[in-house]
Amino acid sequence: MSQEYTEDKDVTLTKLSSGRRLLEALLILIALFAVWLMAALLSFNPSDPSWSQTAWHEPIHNLGGAPGAWLADTLFFIFGVMAYTIPVIIVGGCWFAWRHQSTDDYIDYFAVSLRLIGVLALILTSCGLAAINADDIWYFASGGVIGSLLSTTLQPLLHSSGGTIMLLCIWAAGLTLFTGWSWVSIAEKLGGWLLNILTFASNRTRRDDTWVDDEEYDDEYDEETDGVQRESRRARILRGALARRKRLAEKFSNPRGRQTDAALFSGKRMDDDEDIQYSARGVAADPDDVLFSGNRATQPEYDEYDPLLNGHSVTEPVAAAAAATAVTQTWAASADPIMQTPPMPGAEPVVAQPTVEWQPVPGPQTGEPVIAPAPEGYQPHPQYAQPQEAQSAPWQQPVPVASAPQYAATPATAAEYDSLAPQETQPQWQPEPTHQPTPVYQPEPIAAEPSHMPPPVIEQPVATEPEPDTEETRPARPPLYYFEEVEEKRAREREQLAAWYQPIPEPVKENVPVKPTVSVAPSIPPVEAVAAAASLDAGIKSGALAAGAAAAAPAFSLATGGAPRPQVKEGIGPQLPRPNRVRVPTRRELASYGIKLPSQRIAEEKAREAERNQYETGAQLTDEEIDAMHQDELARQFAQSQQHRYGETYQHDTQQAEDDDTAAEAELARQFAASQQQRYSGEQPAGAQPFSLDDLDFSPMKVLVDEGPHEPLFTPGVMPESTPVQQPVAPQPQPQYQQPQQPVAPQPQYQQPQQPVAPQPQYQQPQQPVAPQPQYQQPQQPVAPQPQYQQPQQPVAPQPQYQQPQQPVAPQPQYQQPQQPVAPQPQYQQPQQPTAPQDSLIHPLLMRNGDSRPLQRPTTPLPSLDLLTPPPSEVEPVDTFALEQMARLVEARLADFRIKADVVNYSPGPVITRFELNLAPGVKAARISNLSRDLARSLSTVAVRVVEVIPGKPYVGLELPNKKRQTVYLREVLDNAKFRENPSPLTVVLGKDIAGDPVVADLAKMPHLLVAGTTGSGKSVGVNAMILSMLYKAQPEDVRFIMIDPKMLELSVYEGIPHLLTEVVTDMKDAANALRWSVNEMERRYKLMSALGVRNLAGYNEKIAEAARMGRPIPDPYWKPGDSMDVQHPVLEKLPYIVVLVDEFADLMMTVGKKVEELIARLAQKARAAGIHLVLATQRPSVDVITGLIKANIPTRIAFTVSSKIDSRTILDQGGAESLLGMGDMLYSGPNSTMPVRVHGAFVRDQEVHAVVQDWKARGRPQYVDGITSDSESEGGGGGFDGGEELDALFDQAVNFVTQKRKASISGVQRQFRIGYNRAARIIEQMEAQGIVSAQGHNGNREVLAPPPFE
C-alpha cells in the first residue's frame, strides 16, 4: 500500500514545447514588470524628475529609479488614481493566459471585439467616476486627463449626480461586455452568498441559545449501555454523533417544537389575540387563565370563561386540578404574577411597606384579612375635585387583581426544579385574627403622586415543616412514549423561556403604579388541596381589596426607598423572579371586588366643563387676583406633595428640624457676634448701635413662607412683622444689602420669618475697620450706596426687607454728600453663585468709566512691566537643517523658471525668513518679482514677498513665512535698551523686524503717522501698542491725548486716564470741533513761541524751565484784563505734547467731509513745531479717504495687510502690502526713507490694556479742558486753553450791511466788500455764532435776527 502511494506521488519533469517555454517566460517577465510598476507607483514622489519636471540635482526617491518616476508620473497624468489598478490588471491577464494556454479553440473575433469594447468602456467610465467623485492626488487630477475630459464634458449637461449615474450604467454594461456575466447571475450569486451567511449565523445563534444541555441525554444513553460491552472509541463517537443528529432532527421536525420556536422568536406577547394559546403543558390555554389566556384589560365585552363575572365558582376547577396535580402534574414557576396575590394558608410574607400590611388568605385556621389603615397623609378626594388635574385620571392606572390559583408539585418531579427555583419554606401556623370589615377607598388622582415608586420587599419566613421527600425511580429502559414525554417537557421549558423574553414596553405618558412582587406559594400536601380550593374564593376577594388599597396608597415611601428590587434575574432559567405580565382587570371585575370607578367619558366631560368654568372665572378676575390664586394653588400642591412624600411624620420632622436649626443658628450667631465684638469693640463710630443677633436672623428657606413684598420698603419708622403665609414662591436670589449704621436714623430691622435655619453670616474683610462708610440720601433709589454683595449657599435666597429714611429726622450734617470720603473702601464678598439681575441699570459694568472706586495709588512714577504678559521662557531653536533644505528648494524652483540664483544667506525671524539670493550676471530682479505668485505656488506657501533692494547688500531678498509662527509680546519689546534710553516722551514701539530686533520709532520725528489695513489685519492692536508705549514713557504733563473713536469700541477703554484732554470723542460733529480746537491751539502756541524766540515746543519748554529756575516766571504777553477772571497777570506754563488719534479716519471723512480734510491738512503742515501730532488709522485705504493733500504732509506710513496692489500703492506708493500674512504683519515706511521695513507687530491683549489703564486711573483723575468739543467755540473762533479767535476786520461793517439790507448771503458780502468767498463765508459763520443771522434753511437762505440800526 505504501509503495502504491509513493508511485502515485512521484513528480516527473516534463519538457515543454518551444512555444510553451516562450509563453511562460514572457508571463513571468510581465508579472515581474507589474510588481516593479506597482512599487514605482506606490513610491512616487513629485520632486523626482519626470515628464512634468525635468531639472533636478538631488537623489531620486522612487524605488523604480528614474524610469519608474517617469512612468509613474505619466500614468498618473493619464489615468489618475486608476493607475494603481494597472499592475493588478496585468497580473490578472497573465493568470488568464496561463490558465487558457492549453485550449486550442478557434478565436472568436466577435467576442474579442466585444471584450475590447468592454475594456474601453470600463477604463473611460472608471476614470470619469474618479474625476467626479474622488479627490485629486498630488498635483494630478483624480481621473487623469481622460477623467478630466469626461467630467468637463458631462458637468454642464448632466451635473455631477447625473454624470455619475450615467457613467455607472455604462460601467455596468462594459463589465457585461468584458466578462460575459449577466447581472441577473451576479445578483443571484450575491444573494446566495448573503443567504448562506445569514443561514449560518441564524443556525449558529439558535444552536447557542438552546440552554438545554445535551449531556443530560448522554447520561441516559450511558445508563442504557452499562451492561453492554464497551465499544471502541470511534464507534462511540459515531454513535453519539448519529444520535445527537437524530435528536436535533426530531426537535426541529416536531410540529409542536416548531410552534414553540415561532412563539419564541415572533416577538408577540402573551396577552396578544391569537387563535391558539399554548400553555406550559403544550395544550391550548384555558380561557379563564389569568396569565396565559390572552385576555386584555381593555377587553370590554363579556367573557363566559371569566372567573370573576361568569357566575361560576372557582372552587370546582381548582379542587379538581389540585387533586390531579397532586398525582401527575408538576408545579412550574414560570407564570408568577407581578402583582401581590394572597398566599396560601400558613404563608405570611412580611412586606416592608409602611402603608399597607398584607394578611394571609383565610383558611381553616385564619379568617378574613385586615387591611392596615391608610396613613394620615392619605386624603380621599372625590374624582376631579381639582379641574386643573383633569389630565391624569385615576382609572388610567391598572389596578392589581389576584392571579390564578397555584398548584402544588408532585414529590416525584419537584426535585428537578430545586436547583433553579428559589428556596421556598413552610411558614408557621398562626392563630386566627379578628375579623374586621375592609374599607373601600377611592383612588386619588395620580398628579399629586411622585413618579417613582420602589417595589415592596418581601421577607420570607423561616421554614419549620419540610416537605416529605420521595425518591424518584427511573425505569431501567424508557417507556414506549419516553421521547414524547421529553419533547413535551422541552416544549414546556421553551414556553417558559418565551415568557422570560417577552418585550416589556416602557410607559410613555402615564405613571404606572408599582407592582408588588408575590412570594411563591410553598408546596401543599395533596390532602389539603380541597380545603385550599374551598377557601380560595374569599382569598381572591381579599387580595383584590388589598391590591386596590395598594394602588391608592402614596407612590413614594421612605421606608422602602433603598430596598433592593426582587424582580432581578440572577441567572439563566425561568424559575427566578421576573417581570411577567398579568392581565389587568376590567372595570366590571373591579366592580365585583367593590372598587367602583366612574366612567372615563363622564369624567373627561366634567373635567373640560370645570376648565371652561375656571377660564371664564379667570377672565373676569384681575391680574392680581389671578396671581394670588396661582400662588395659593402652588402652595396647596406643594403641601400636598410634601404630605404624600413624607406621610404623617412630615409635620413632626419639620418641627424637630426647626428646633435643631434654631439652636444651631443661635450658637453660630453668638460665636460670630463675639468674634466681631472682639475685633471692632473699640473702633465703632459714635452713635453706632452695638451688634445684635437679630441682624443675622435670616435663612434661604424663609422665602417659602415669606409673603412680604420683594422690593425694599422705605419708611421712617420700623416696619412691623407681618404674619407670613406658606407659599412656594419660585426662588429668586436677590443680593443682600447691608444698611450702614447711621448715628441719627434708627437701626433697620429685618423681617424674621417663622422657619429659621442655619444663618448665612456676612463676612467682612478687615481692610479698613476704622473709617465708616459715607451715608448718602437717596429717596428715589432703593440701592444702598455701599452694598455688600453676598450670595447665599442655598439655591433659594432670602429676600430681606430693610428700611431707609426718606428724609432726615433732623437737619444733621451726616446726610450731606461729602466731597471726598475718608476711606470709602467697599467690602465685597466673594459670591458663591451668580446673583439675580437687579431692577436698576446702575451696575459697575454698565458705567462708562468702569468701576469708580478709589484705587490704591502706585508708588512708581510709571506703570510696571509686570502688568504685561511675559514672553515664554523657552524659545524654540532655529532648525538650520530645515532652512538649508528650503534654500536648496528655492534654488531648484528658480531653476525651473530658468533663473540661476544661489542662496548665500538666510535670516530667520519670528514670523518669516529672508533668503538672500545672488543672481547670475544679466538676471533682472524684476523677473523674480513677477514670479512671486508662481514661486508661492511651487513652494507651497501662503505668500512670497520679493525685496528687490536690500540696503547695503548686492542681493535680492526672498521672504518666506515660517511653518510655526511665533508671537511678539509687547513686554519683550518695551524691555529693551533702545526703548529705555530714548529720551523722547513720544517714543513708540512697533514690534520686531525679520531678524528679531525691536523696532522703536519717535512720533516727534515722524511727525504724523498714517495707518491703514483691512479688517482683522491687526491695525487696532498696533494702535493700542503705540498708545501703551507712550503711557509707559510719559507723564500726563508731558503728553496729552485727544482720542476720536467713531466705532466706540477701540479707544473707549482709555476713558478716565489722566493723559486725556477731553473725553473720548465718539460723535463725528464733536470730532470736527476737536480738530478745529487743535488748529486754534496750534495758532496760539505759534504766537507764544514767536514771542519767546524759539523754533519748537522743546525750546519753549526749556525757556519756561529756565525762568522757573531763575525764580522769575514769564508772564503771558497776549493776556488782556478782560480775557479771564484772574486778578494777577497769568504766567506761562509748560506745554505738553498733544497726540490726536483717529481710529477710523474714513468714517470721519464720510460724515464731516471737506472741513475735516482742511483741518487735517493744516495740522499736518504746521503742527509739528507746535508739538501736535496726528495718528490716523483707517480700514479703507482708497484715494477718496487718503487724499493727495494728506499724503503729501504725512510721510510716515504703516501698511497692514490689504486686499490688492492698488491699495498698497495708495498707502505706500509701492506694492508689497498685499503679500503680508496678517495678524500684525506690517510694512513700516519711516521718515526720510523710501524703502519700507517689514515689522511684526507686538501683540497686546485686552487684559493688558485694562491693567495699564487701571494703573493710570489710580494715579490721578484727568483734567479736562472745557470747550474742545463745544459748538460755540468751534464756530465763534474761541480756541486754545484760555483764548479765542479774533473776529474779522470787516465784521462790523458786514453786520451793518446785513442788518440794513435784511438779507444775509455770502455772495452779497463778497460783492459788497470785494473779498474772497472763503473770507465772506467765515464772516457769515461768525454772524451765525453771534446770533445775528440764523442757520441755513432747507433752501439755503438765512434770516436776519438782529434789528436794523437806528437812523
From Swiss-Prot:
Region Disordered, residue ranges: 357-482, 559-589, 602-871, 1264-1283
Residue ranges crossing the lipid bilayer per the database entry: 25-44, 75-98, 116-132, 163-179
SMART domains according to UniProt: Ftsk_gamma (SM00843)
Polar residues composition bias: residue spans: 385-395
Composition skew (Low complexity), residue ranges: 402-415, 422-433, 665-674, 724-838, 858-868
Coiled-coil features, chain-numbered ranges: none
Main location class: membrane
Alphabetical list of InterPro entries matching this protein: FtsK/SpoIIIE/SftA, FtsK_4TM, FtsK_alpha, FtsK_dom, Ftsk_gamma, P-loop_NTPase, WH-like_DNA-bd_sf, WH_DNA-bd_sf
Keywords from the UniProt entry: ATP-binding, Cell cycle, Cell division, Cell inner membrane, Cell membrane, Chromosome partition, DNA-binding, Membrane, Nucleotide-binding, Transmembrane, Transmembrane helix
Superkingdom of the organism of origin: Bacteria
Residues at which ATP binds: 1016-1021
Membrane topology (UniProt): Multi-pass membrane protein
GO molecular function, one term: DNA translocase activity
A Gene Ontology term for the protein's cellular component: plasma membrane
Cytoplasmic domain ranges by topology: 1-24, 99-115, 180-1351
Biased composition (Basic and acidic residues): 602-614
Single GO biological process annotation from the record: chromosome segregation
Periplasmic membrane side: 45-74, 133-162
Location in or out of the cell: Cell inner membrane
Domain FtsK: 996-1209
Quaternary structure note: Homohexamer. Forms a ring that surrounds DNA.
Domain notes: Consists of an N-terminal domain, which is sufficient for the localization to the septal ring and is required for cell division, followed by a linker domain, and a C-terminal domain, which forms the translocation motor involved in chromosome segregation. The C-terminal domain can be further subdivided into alpha, beta and gamma subdomains. The alpha and beta subdomains multimerise to produce a hexameric ring, contain the nucleotide binding motif and form the DNA pump.
Family: Belongs to the FtsK/SpoIIIE/SftA family.
Function of the protein: Essential cell division protein that coordinates cell division and chromosome segregation. The N-terminus is involved in assembly of the cell-division machinery. The C-terminus functions as a DNA motor that moves dsDNA in an ATP-dependent manner towards the dif recombination site, which is located within the replication terminus region. Translocation stops specifically at Xer-dif sites, where FtsK interacts with the Xer recombinase, allowing activation of chromosome unlinking by recombination. FtsK orienting polar sequences (KOPS) guide the direction of DNA translocation.
Protein name (record): DNA translocase FtsK
